[in-house]
Amino acid sequence: MPSENLAAARVHLQALVNTYRENFAQYQRATYNETQVRVDFVNPLFQLLGWDIMNEAGLPQHLREVTHEATVLVEENGTHRSKKPDYSFKVGTETLFFLETKKPFVNITVDRAPAFQLRRYGWSGNLKVSVLTNFTDLFIYDCTVRPVEGDEIGTALIAHYHYTEYDEKFDEIYSVLSKESALSGEFQRVFGNIRGAMRREPFDAYFLDQIRGWRMQLGKDVVKRNPELDTETLNIFVQRILNRSIFLRICEDKNLENYESLKRITTYQELKHLFAAADQKYDSGLFEMLDEDRLVISDSVIIEIFQSLYYPNNSYEFGVVDPYIIGQIYELFLDESLEIQVDGQVVCVQKPEVVDAQGTVNTPKNITDIIVDEALGALYEGKTPEEVAGYRIADICCGSGNFLLSAFEYVVNYHIEYLCQNSLEEALQSGKLYQLPGTQNLFLSYEQKRTILENLIYGVDIDPLAIEVTKFSLLLKVLEDSSAEELDAYHARTHNRILPNLDENIKLGNSLVDSNYAHYNRAVYQNLQLMNKMRMFDWNREFTEGKFDAIIGNPPYIRVQNMVHYSPE
């Protein structure tokens, strides 16, 4: 910000602080609520830091610098807390930090709950830092430090400013929390490598370690209880148990399932009943048991895993976890698989192709968004929803589905932006769009999102576990921003199960080899094991509607000379 603008901002800040000081006793009353302190003081403070708090630039919703959330209170351990932070501050589509506000009556220098709540949000959101304020005080917290019950207010605290210091330390505050700091890279430089933090365990690394541990726990127990299992069946079964359980746990924090429904499970038989009820509600194939009814898991293993999904054993806030983060975690998770050794022991081994490539490297979301924008931008530009309704998008080596998540998000945002610009009133009246009460946030209806997912998004992968994860990630994504009331209304109106079945969209196969290969190598027909491993894929048979309008993705790049090390066939 030019020095003259910075000086003007300081003058406005001084006036803001003086108003607060002169009426301090009034603002300290219990009747002066959070909404009032946001409007009177918090919004103006962050506007002085350069943020477009009220979207005066008229940016599309997905590109707004600041997103406001409606307050939804839930009960946990006898106390009430909100489900989402009050504000999200973003650059482009990347969230930089959350801001949680409390009314001045709440003394955040004494009460530990607000800081702990904010840190749960920031940690689960996989953010570097987040901010807590009641305007009297402003705290910046390191959100790479995992919140643990009993943490003090000072745990993971980076900076603390009293309102009487805002003027004196404005340059310092501006240098780390301003929009200019975010755009210049100063925010990332300052908070990208915070020194001296204790117990630094970012959400993505911690949750990856947890699900790896759960996989091994389940794998060993399942083989012990079901010794006839082969390795592939074991991996798919364990993956499905994890996917279903994590899906339901995420739905709990999104108010789509009763909270602690998994925590109350005491036997595997009860879990199967829960999955059967979920299958009736959601359909989608995610909860279909197939031959798995015959397999047995020890009750104690189920109980231990489910207990670790809840506070106080862990501080997960799945309501703020981006499906893309889950996809990235699973992408690393898929580097390894369970293997049953000749002596019946279960071990976790890294896939040979991953060893050769020295590990999987995730494609960051901002990169997938850029690639998808380049691929789809020219297709969608200047067209109406009717004109793009049949555009089919595919990732032919989809892995955990992150490119498909970005593609789905692109199409949803295109529809929101088009309707806002061309037929907002009609879209709201017809239900194509809905506005979250108490906010400016507009969302595409669940029915519209489901139609997009079912008709436009397709993927193929040779790894059956990747197929399971891609479906799982896309189903989480289509539920994003949908309430239980909206889903129930959709079910009552259409008589459809809530979730789409993606078996015709996301398919298992080798996208580079079809059955014509057998004409050149007839020996394949004599080797059933080789045929199963090759997973030949006939595009015309699997996707009868024909061509795709856009192919996206970032397939594994492996030198042909190295392929023989892990796939000699």
Residue ranges and their predicted role:
Residues 49-54, 251-262, 337-340:
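Short helix-capping/linker segments at secondary-structure and domain boundaries
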Residues 25, 29-46:
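Nuclease catalytic cores
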